[in-house]
């Protein structure tokens, strides 16, 4: 009954009536004067709290972020996170409706009994730019003589201070002696410009035009494309071939054009988008009605269609396919409630999160989404370094169909569109458990205006099965539950919604889970069933998942940039390959299991396909556990999933996409730390002609032995469509892990006792 005040129809009317009469017999007083009363339900919901009524216990439960409150009508106390709190004014009932004092929210939720949110006394140097700082950066940039009217903003984000200084702050509390600085990326027409702005001294430190770069697709480009399509008489005429007479019912999806060395007939220096379209039939799912074999090429500078590419006319699939369940009667499901009656086990201080032995900083970036920084683990009082920064590096969704409406489709979702900008607000109780704390985040829009995204990130703790268990005959059972802290973020890029979870285990493991849901991009075909004459040809590149609709085979490939600092920055990549070796020690066995251990000493050697039967470690060979083993973290790019694993790029080596985006084909990369090397696809991948990302970073083959190394893991799935994913796709996951390997001296959760 969250988000609503409801009373069960069970026969408790007499008890409730008595409570109502007793509670409203006379005026209610607070501090010697008559209290001003307001409706509990409306007031608390406007505050953002869930309101629940327990008809049996005659009690309200109020939940807001870290506060879990129980209060009975007429009672002089409430229970807040398991502790008693005196109420200046009790909850009263009148005519079946609950009323509270207008000071109730302050009395209860500002009582200090909820310790989830703490005041940040020393701002973390990696805190996101505030709304005021974003506005200041824009003001400074606009005052520059080089700034041109109508310039748009691709990104306004924190320019990070020196890494060593940030670690000194996180570990010793040493203040960072540097002004707050912003990176500003702009689009002046089709020209990309980078600026670095000193916010404290209100001056521009650098102003750099970037030659040959194509900027991101911005949100107003979507509006421009729709207007161009709607007002084009040429496009309207072509639509008639497809039986469409009203261009106003056509929904466009602007897509980047890729790079084909001129074989697609497109001018390389132009700012172009390809547009595929769908018909809005009124069923709420225009994705089910593709206008197949029709592509408009739009010049964003000229604001016009410069080319229309066509194939054979395929009738638009017209069968209604709503995905919101409007035409289904699903069975009613009883509530499943997750409660934390004594409050949260974690605290949030500014943007720093503390849970169990973990501490980390969290901020949202407009391109890659959440960035987790200064990740440490408290090992018996010693704060140990694990990771300086971890984030999505980039991702790509390439399709395998060569037809006119598909051959160019290879979506670089973060690099071309900005996945942080496309953050989807999280709905508590649906997108995240009901016990989640939702965090708002502020980024800049394309005009430079600060924009706050409500519920951008969810934080929650969950039960995750037994941490360990053993039952010895004749002795008591020994077991404890596993808890996980999840940082969840969702980005909606066109038809797909991507869920990213950073999962902290109390045993030192970090999970990275990438989930894909939403609606598949589908192709209109002639075949209704696999028995139709055209079915074999229609399904050459995909699966018939509905009448006249094929789900085209594609991949979801994710890359994560993980600047691991395992007990410090001098790390080495170590391989351990379990092998079968002959038995030379005697006895009946002819073979043994042994481990071949060796160092991988350079960037080129580190770029590898992942073999799940082997072990790859980032080790600090100068630090040992008590047995003398070097402390390490295991890197597992693919630890399971629900779709076939993407073991590499499903493209021939002579494809341009293969050469532009090397990160797709190998699951493990390790490079030397350089602060400007942040994106596996390169900083400006839109229409890039060669690899400016990981392939370039590793080209100089720097040494990795006892250096500050950055791990990049590529994971994902090859998506072969099935009927059960249409018209909306259940979330499909790819899982990765970072796992302590001789990092500790013993089972790190030994002796844990959880209530």
Curated annotation (Swiss-Prot):
Reaction catalysis annotation: a primary methyl amine + O2 + H2O = an aldehyde + H2O2 + NH4(+)
UniProt PTM: Topaquinone (TPQ) is generated by copper-dependent autoxidation of a specific tyrosyl residue.
Record: residues binding Ca(2+) 1: 563-565, 708
Disulfide bridge map: none
GO molecular function per UniProt: copper ion binding; primary methylamine oxidase activity; quinone binding
Pfam families on file: Cu_amine_oxid, Cu_amine_oxidN1, Cu_amine_oxidN2, Cu_amine_oxidN3
List of residues binding substrate: 411-422, 493-498
Gene3D superfamilies reported in the protein's UniProt record: 3.10.450.40, Copper amine oxidase, catalytic domain, Copper amine oxidase-like, N-terminal domain
EC number: 1.4.3.21
Residues binding Mn(2+), per UniProt: 563, 565, 708
Active site: 413 (proton acceptor), 496 (schiff-base intermediate with substrate)
Signal peptide: 1-30
Binding site for Cu cation: 554, 556, 719
Transmembrane segments: none
UniProt KW keywords: Catecholamine metabolism, Copper, Manganese, Metal-binding, Oxidoreductase, Periplasm, Signal, TPQ
2',4',5'-topaquinone: residues bearing it: 496
UniProt record, GO biological process: catecholamine metabolic process
Gene Ontology CC entries for this record: periplasmic space
Cofactor note (record): Binds 1 copper ion per subunit. Can also use zinc ion as cofactor. Binds 2 calcium ions per subunit.
Binding site residues for Ca(2+) 2: 603, 697, 700, 702
Cofactor list: Cu cation; Zn(2+); Ca(2+); L-topaquinone
InterPro entries for the chain: Cu_Am_Ox_Cu-bd, Cu_Am_ox_TPQ-bd, Cu_amine_oxidase, Cu_amine_oxidase-like_N, Cu_amine_oxidase_C, Cu_amine_oxidase_C_sf, Cu_amine_oxidase_N-reg, Cu_amine_oxidase_N2
Family: Belongs to the copper/topaquinone oxidase family.
Function noted in UniProt: Active on tyramine, tryptamine, beta-phenethylamine and dopamine.
Assembly mode: Homodimer.
Protein's name according to its UniProt entry: Primary amine oxidase
Natural source organism: Klebsiella aerogenes (Enterobacter aerogenes)
Gene: maoA
């Amino acid at each position: 009954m969250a988000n609503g005040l409801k009373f069960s129809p069970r026969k408790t009317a007499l008890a409730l009536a008595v409570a109502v009469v007793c509670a409203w017999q006379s005026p209610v007083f607070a501090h010697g004067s008559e209290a001003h009363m307001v409706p509990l339900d409306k007031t608390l919901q406007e505050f953002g709290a869930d309101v629940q009524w327990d008809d049996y216990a005659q009690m309200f439960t109020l939940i807001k972020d870290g506060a879990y409150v129980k209060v009975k009508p007429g009672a002089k106390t409430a229970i807040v996170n398991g502790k008693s709190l005196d109420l200046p004014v009790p909850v009263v009932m009148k005519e079946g409706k609950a009323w509270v004092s207008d000071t109730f929210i302050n009395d209860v939720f500002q009582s200090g009994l909820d310790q989830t949110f703490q005041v940040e006394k020393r701002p973390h140097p990696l805190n996101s730019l505030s709304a005021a700082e974003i506005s200041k950066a824009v003001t400074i940039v606009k005052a520059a003589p080089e700034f041109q009217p109508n310039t748009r903003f691709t990104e306004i984000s924190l320019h990070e201070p020196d890494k060593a200084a940030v670690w000194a702050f996180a570990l010793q509390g040493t203040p960072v002696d540097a002004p707050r600085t912003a990176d500003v990326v702009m689009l002046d027409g089709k020209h990309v410009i980078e600026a670095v702005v000193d916010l404290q001294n209100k001056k521009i430190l650098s102003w750099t035009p970037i030659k040959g770069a194509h900027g991101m697709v911005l949100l107003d480009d979507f509006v421009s494309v729709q207007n161009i399509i709607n007002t084009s008489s040429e496009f309207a005429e072509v639509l008639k071939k497809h039986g469409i007479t009203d261009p106003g019912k056509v929904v466009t999806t602007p897509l980047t054009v890729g790079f084909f060395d001129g074989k697609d007939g497109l001018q390389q220096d132009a700012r172009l988008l390809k547009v595929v379209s769908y018909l809005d039939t009124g069923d709420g799912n225009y994705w089910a009605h593709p206008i197949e074999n029709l592509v408009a090429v739009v010049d964003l500078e000229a604001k016009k269609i410069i080319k229309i590419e066509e194939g054979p006319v395929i009738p638009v699939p017209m069968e209604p396919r709503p995905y919101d369940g409007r035409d289904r009667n699903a069975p009613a499901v009883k509530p499943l409630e997750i409660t934390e009656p004594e409050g949260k086990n974690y605290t949030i201080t500014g943007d720093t999160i503390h849970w169990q032995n973990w501490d980390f900083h969290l901020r949202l970036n407009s391109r890659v989404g959440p960035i987790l920084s200064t990740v440490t683990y408290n090992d018996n009082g010693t704060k140990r370094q694990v990771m300086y920064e971890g984030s999505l590096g980039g991702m790509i969704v390439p399709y395998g169909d060569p037809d006119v409406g598909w051959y160019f489709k290879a979506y670089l979702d973060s690099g071309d569109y900005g996945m942080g900008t496309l953050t989807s607000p999280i709905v508590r109780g649906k997108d995240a458990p009901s016990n989640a704390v939702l965090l708002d985040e502020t980024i800049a829009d394309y005009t430079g205006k600060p924009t706050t995204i409500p519920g951008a990130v969810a934080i929650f703790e969950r039960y995750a099965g037994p941490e360990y268990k053993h039952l010895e005959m004749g002795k008591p059972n020994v077991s404890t539950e596993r808890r996980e802290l999840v940082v969840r973020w969702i980005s909606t890029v066109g038809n797909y919604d991507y869920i990213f979870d950073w999962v902290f285990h109390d045993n030192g493991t970090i999970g990275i889970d990438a989930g894909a849901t939403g609606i598949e991009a589908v192709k209109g075909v002639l075949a209704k069933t696999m028995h139709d004459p055209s079915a074999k040809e229609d399904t050459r590149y995909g699966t018939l998942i509905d009448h006249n609709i094929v789900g085209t085979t594609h991949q979801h490939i994710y890359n994560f940039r993980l600047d691991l600092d395992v007990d410090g920055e001098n790390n080495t990549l170590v391989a351990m390959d379990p092998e079968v070796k002959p038995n030379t020690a005697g006895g009946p066995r002819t073979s043994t299991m042994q481990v071949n251990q060796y160092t991988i000493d350079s960037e080129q050697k580190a770029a590898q396909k992942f073999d799940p039967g082997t072990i790859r470690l980032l080790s600090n060979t100068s630090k040992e556990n008590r047995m003398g083993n070097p402390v390490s973290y295991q890197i597992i790019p693919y630890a399971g999933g629900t779709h076939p694993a993407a073991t590499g790029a499903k493209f021939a080596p002579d494809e341009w996409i293969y050469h532009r985006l090397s990160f797709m084909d190998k699951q493990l990369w390790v490079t030397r730390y350089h602060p400007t090397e942040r994106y596996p696809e390169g900083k400006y991948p839109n229409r890039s002609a060669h690899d400016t990302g990981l392939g370039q970073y590793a080209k100089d083959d720097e040494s990795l032995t006892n250096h500050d190394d950055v791990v990049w893991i590529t994971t994902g799935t090859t998506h072969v469509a099935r009927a059960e994913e249409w018209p909306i796709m259940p979330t499909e996951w790819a899982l990765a892990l970072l796992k302590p390997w001789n990092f500790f001296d013993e089972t790190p959760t030994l002796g844990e006792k959880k209530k």
